[in-house]
Amino acid sequence: METMDTSVDLPGRWIDIEKIIKRTGPFASPSFEPDTKASPNIMNGLQNDFKVLVIGAGGLGCEILKNLALSGFRNIDVIDMDTIDISNLNRQFLFRRKDVGKSKAEVAAAFINSRITGCNVTPHKCRIQDKDEDYYRQFKIVIAGLDSIEARRWINGLLVNLVVVNDSGDIEPDTIIPLVDGGTEGFKGQARVILPKISSCFECSLDAFPPQVSYAICTIANTPRVPEHCIQWALLFGLQDATLEKPFDPKQFDNDNPDHMNWLFECAKKRAEKFNINGVTYKLTQGVAKNIIPAIASTNAIIAAACCNEVFKFCTDSSGYLNNYMMYNGLNGVYTFTFEYEIKEGCAVCGTNLVTFEIDKSNTLSTFLEKITTDSRFQFKKPSLRSNGRNLYMQGLLHQSTVPNLEKTLSELNVQEDDEITITDPALPGNLAVRMRIKYTS
């Protein structure tokens, strides 16, 4: 494909955009000042100043990239760690058969850059966690098209952390980076505008998402009973076990990599044989290791359009932006509903209060761990616990030294009424932690 001349725009390229930014309207923000021929500030902002980050270059991400580029945005970064699979081609329209096996971010960026005059999409084939805070500070707005709750929680927490509150308790407006979050599942979808520290954050509504099926860690480690326990053991402990030979770096485990998944399957199968458990299959291993979400091209198009409209409105002030959640259901016709998610008191990310958690004093730490990992408010994945300056249970290198604590009661571990337990988890970014106050029911 030939690259178009990016030195000038084609005549009439932005005629539809100009109809919005060159005249005011009933829904325009009070601060909106229409562009003039002598002072095209909004168009200059779109094309030169407003840098947008797109997270995800899959079904939703392809639509988002196309929409942003055709809306006048020229400085776009896209992050996606995945490679293109042949099953993506029916809906992820920026990819072709020759692209199978290549980076989604790199191919999508190259396609947009070659097709749309003047657009500069910079790809990054990596995890969002691989970028530091300074990288994210450069963007005017972030738009996420992710199918992972964990990743959405992480970027939400990071953007909340980037907000600076001065000594007077006031938020520094320049440190607010809005997050436009889109998600689809089959014929359903949602678009949401999150203003960190101002509106409710993603974590405030975490209990609206069904928690993933989880199992008690002590059961996985000591008394597995079903095939899923063996697969979870391979994920949680097999990858960390230095005595097990692996053809890859455990820190770089990728559930989309066939070689990595084959290793996981064989590891789980050996674990199952040890405990005389039948039923570990490659397909089941895939199902446990990753959640496969059905995708419909038309749903992606609708939600991407809604998300990009919000980005455009926010950057141009041409209309008030969404406050703050829109849901779509196309299962039996076309249905949309908009409402405001309220800030949740005691939110682990944007709240300031301790989270109160009630539990029986005789419960073991293992039971406590199981309760907080299955609680829809938190949906922890691999939590580590500290209280009174000591480690109660830790992941990683300190796992072996703290495992014995799992069978002890909270009182035996000297956790008293109203004591604070600090919980860190991979789902939370950086040094963010949940502070939990313990209340005993008996």
Swiss-Prot record:
It comes from Dictyostelium discoideum. The record marks 192 as: Determines specificity for NEDD8. The gene is uba3. Heterodimer of uba3 and nae1. The complex binds nedd8 and ube2m. It is an enzyme of class 6 (ligase). Arg-192 acts as a selectivity gate, preventing misactivation of ubiquitin by this nedd8-specific E1 complex. Nae1 and uba3 correspond to the N-terminal and the C-terminal part of yeast uba3. In yeast the two subunits form a single polypeptide chain. Keywords: ATP-binding, Ligase, Nucleotide-binding, Ubl conjugation pathway. It holds the Pfam family E2_bind. This is NEDD8-activating enzyme E1 catalytic subunit. InterPro entries: E2-binding, ThiF/MoeB/HesA, ThiF_NAD_FAD-bd, Ub_act_enz_dom_a_sf, Uba3_N, Ubiquitin-activating_enz. ATP binds at residues 80-104, 128-151. It comes from the Eukaryota. The keyword Protein transport does not apply. GO terms for biological process: protein neddylation. Belongs to the ubiquitin-activating E1 family. UBA3 subfamily. The keyword Heme does not apply. The active site is at residue 218. SUPFAM superfamilies: Activating enzymes of the ubiquitin-like proteins. Its EC number is 6.2.1.64. It catalyses: ATP + [NEDD8 protein] + [E1 NEDD8-activating enzyme]-L-cysteine = AMP + diphosphate + [E1 NEDD8-activating enzyme]-S-[NEDD8 protein]-yl-L-cysteine.
